[in-house]
UniProtKB/Swiss-Prot annotation:
A Pfam family that the UniProt record links to this protein: Flu_NP
Protein name: Nucleoprotein
Post-translational modification: Late in virus-infected cells, may be cleaved from a 56-kDa protein to a 53-kDa protein by a cellular caspase. This cleavage might be a marker for the onset of apoptosis in infected cells or have a specific function in virus host interaction.
Renumbered residue ranges of the record's region Disordered: 1-21
Biological processes per GO annotation: symbiont entry into host cell; viral penetration into host nucleus
InterPro entries (alphabetical): Flu_NP
Motif Unconventional nuclear localization signal per record, residues: 1-18
Subcellular locations according to the entry: Virion; Host nucleus
Organism: Influenza A virus (strain A/Hong Kong/156/1997 H5N1 genotype Gs/Gd)
Family recorded in the similarity comment: Belongs to the influenza viruses nucleoprotein family.
Keywords, ordered alphabetically: Capsid protein, Helical capsid protein, Host nucleus, Host-virus interaction, Ribonucleoprotein, RNA-binding, Viral nucleoprotein, Viral penetration into host nucleus, Virion, Virus entry into host cell
Length: 498
């Protein structure tokens, strides 16, 4: 990437810091996850949860959501100004599952947001620790990416369900900051921009007045984030056009959809981070592990190591397959929903199957489900190897735009060849090359046509043994090319409904 000099590393974004060296970054990321762990321990104490109840992923999610809600200032302000029946704007809560007489029971808890904020700050040396909050948002987003399909959202904005591999981070809240922007896929950014443009088309005051000025700044900022994800000059130039448009309308929507399609072959750079549930960090802190002193990284061996030694439970519905539930959570932990299944399977050491074949629904349990009929199971979150998380989109060389990997957005920096039928994708480009962006469109299509399926992504990069923490001996796996590796084939997952 040409602009590497001006970019901050994830960990800097993650911790809001200025330029830091590797040791400082590891320490500040360690401080962040340590704070989450301390907060979680304190909440388990407040709620008098047993060790097993504290390791239940459903309880973890409830507690994470409570603290995120307690710090959601915009929504809190909105709730206070528009009081709705039966909702106390000053309180937050959710379902906590407890073990009673050999059965699981659901208990709804309610806490003052002020109290939750106090506990959170206390666990984070008196600071607001926004980085830790963002970290939990990204974990929830990664879980949603692995659990739900976004076909409906894609179709609503005029995009094609085949673009689902571009939708990483599509459920992240807007307030997730730079660390959140880094992990959003090209499709997610395009969708946010299209929604904005559509509002502008329908509401003439959207771009006007003082509010409109702020809207415009947000629009341009989002355009710049998306531009930064593209790796070819022509794609970047088209983004400049979209950003500079006087009043954005259908022409811009067309351009954005074209760009999203082009990203299926000329992949954008999207960051990947292993964000784990709070119930993993908590017990580690409780056992005396000092994350800040030892240092921690979201993109190296640390999360794999932590999961090797963690025990996490999950409630399981009567007809669900515990192994499938484990796969879902494993993928979420490593942000691997869009990774090639061949690569994930190799790293995990057990076969990772497409979502259409999973006998499991989401991790969260709806309020109308009968918990007493449910059992709990230990999630198998260990791996056979570890690999470095990537932010490149899988392009072989940055000099000339080569093909990224189709229908997946690579998570792990591991050599693989590209199993794709370029014909199927190029078929989506029978579109027009007229209009003001014609030369750029022609250039992009030319690049896509010259992308060779036999190219290899991440040349020479491999996976590592879990004992090889310095990543000295890469093992380059060889993959069977006959089967395409997308998680979304034969998809029958539920839609994500907010």
């Amino acid at each position: 990437m040409a602009s590497q000099g001006t970019k901050r590393s994830y960990e800097q974004m993650e911790t809001g810091g200025e330029r830091q060296n590797a040791t400082e970054i590891r320490a500040s990321v360690g401080r962040m996850v340590g704070g989450i762990g301390r907060f979680y321990i304190q909440m388990c104490t407040e709620l008098k949860l047993s060790d097993q109840e504290g390791r239940l992923i459903q309880n973890s999610i409830t507690i994470e959501r409570m603290v995120l809600s307690a710090f959601d200032e915009r929504r809190n302000r909105y709730l206070e100004e528009h009081p709705s029946a039966g909702k106390d704007p000053k309180k937050t809560g959710g379902p906590i599952y407890r073990r009673r007489d050999g059965k699981w029971v659901r208990e709804l808890i309610l806490y003052d947001k002020e109290e939750i904020r106090r506990i959170w700050r206390q666990a984070n040396n008196g600071e607001d620790a926004t980085a830790g909050l963002t970290h939990m948002m990204i974990w929830h987003s990664n879980l949603n990416d692995a659990t739900y399909q976004r076909t409906r959202a894609l179709v609503r904005t005029g995009m094609d369900p085949r673009m689902c591999s571009l939708m990483q981070g599509s459920t992240l809240p807007r307030r997730s900051g730079a660390a959140g922007a880094a992990i959003k896929g090209v499709g997610t950014m395009v969708m946010e921009l299209i929604r904005m443009i559509k509002r502008g088309i329908n509401d003439r005051n959207f771009w006007r007045g003082e509010n409109g000025r702020r809207t415009r700044i947000a629009y341009e900022r989002m355009c710049n984030i998306l531009k930064g994800k593209f790796q070819t000059a022509a794609q970047k130039a088209m983004m400049d056009q979209v950003r500079e448009s006087r009043n954005p309308g259908n022409a811009e929507i067309e351009d954005l959809i074209f760009l999203a399609r082009s990203a299926l072959i000329l992949r954008g750079s999207v960051a990947h981070k292993s964000c784990l549930p709070a119930c993993v960090y908590g017990p580690a802190v409780a056992s005396g592990y000092d994350f800040e002193r030892e240092g921690y990284s979201l993109v190296g061996i640390d999360p794999f190591r932590l999961l090797q030694n963690s025990q996490v439970f999950s409630l399981i519905r009567p007809k669900e397959n515990p192994a499938h539930k484990s796969q879902l959570v494993w993928m979420a932990c490593h942000s691997a929903a869009f990774e090639d299944l061949r690569v994930s399977s190799f790293i995990r050491g057990t076969r990772v199957i497409p979502r259409g074949q999973l006998s499991t629904r989401g991790v969260q349990i709806a309020s109308n489900e009968n918990v007493e009929a449910m059992d709990s199971t230990t999630l198998e979150l260990r791996s056979r190897y570890w690999a470095i998380r990537t932010r490149s989109g899988g392009n072989t060389n940055q000099q000339r735009a080569s093909a990224g990997q189709i229908s997946v957005q690579p998570t792990f920096s591991v050599q693989r060849n590209l199993p794709f039928e370029r014909v199927t994708i190029m078929a989506a480009f029978k579109g027009n090359t007229e209009g003001r962006t014609s030369d750029m469109r022609t250039e992009i299509i030319r690049m896509m046509e010259s992308a060779r399926p036999e190219d290899v992504s991440f040349q020479g990069r491999g996976v590592f043994e879990l004992s090889d923490e310095k990543a000295t001996n890469p093992i380059v796996p060889s993959f069977d090319m006959s089967n395409e590796g997308s998680y979304f084939f034969g998809d029958n997952a539920e839609e994500y409904d907010n």
